[in-house]
A protein has these predicted regions:
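Polar, glycine-rich mid-to-C-terminal structural blocks
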Residues: 1-12, 18
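N-terminal short leaders/motifs
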Residues: 12-28
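Acidic/polar-rich alpha-helix caps and helix-coil junctions
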Residues: 23-203
Length: 203
């Protein structure tokens, strides 16, 4: 178990579909989640996010919140390179497979788990899904779906069913497109009458 006792709060929740998208031998799955199953049916009931939590000190019987703050990661660089390569019409497979090979460890089998280069859309979604698994909880997905597109130069994934886990677009393009920009806080507006609120938000 997590052994957090009465400390901390569970502020981050993920849909079961996301957990089930991992291969069982992908080490990132169990390093990121503690899964809970029904004792009779053995059906997944939910997950607890445990990545970057720190460690439990057996001697003091306390949880130590000492996880490293993630600033920049080599896996992130590889996946950014994959995005660039995809925009240039190149082969993204080697970058995705660099990341997968580390994640699968000794169980890595390129013929079974490796990615093969495809068309722009397939590549773009493969990069996004790999980032989902690799950069989980690191505050990047929102910016990914704003930046990445379904077709080259096309609609951002934030408005596409393909950009979500459950098939529902993150934002409704017809009614929520304004949300890709942040509002200006009320206090700032009150102090400067020349400022205008970002279109779409209440003034």
């Amino acid at each position: 178990t997590l052994k957090v006792g009465t400390t901390g709060q569970q502020r981050i929740e993920y849909k079961s579909q996301f957990f089930l998208a991992y291969d069982k031998i992908d080490t990132r799955r169990d390093a990121s989640f503690l899964s809970a199953y029904h004792k009779e049916t053995n059906k997944l009931q939910g997950t607890i996010f445990k990545k970057i939590m720190g460690h439990f000190n057996q001697t003091t019987n306390q949880y130590v919140w000492d996880a490293d703050a993630v600033l920049y990661r080599l896996a992130g660089v590889y996946l950014m390179m994959a995005e660039v390569e995809n925009m240039q019409g190149g082969d993204v497979a080697k970058y995705i497979n660099f990341v997968r090979e580390r994640a699968y460890g000794k169980a890595w089998d390129k013929a079974k788990y490796g990615y093969e280069n495809a068309d722009f859309t397939t590549n773009e979604l493969a990069i996004l899904h790999e980032k989902d698994k690799e950069m989980l909880g690191e505050g990047q997905r929102w910016w990914d779906v704003l930046r990445m597109t379904l077709t080259k130069g096309g609609k951002p994934l934030v408005f596409c069913t393909e950009g979500s886990v459950d098939g529902t677009p993150i934002l409704n393009e017809a009614t929520e497109a304004y949300k890709v920009l942040w509002p200006i806080e009320t206090e700032m507006l009150n102090k400067d009458p020349k400022l205008e609120q970002t279109p779409g938000y209440v003034k």
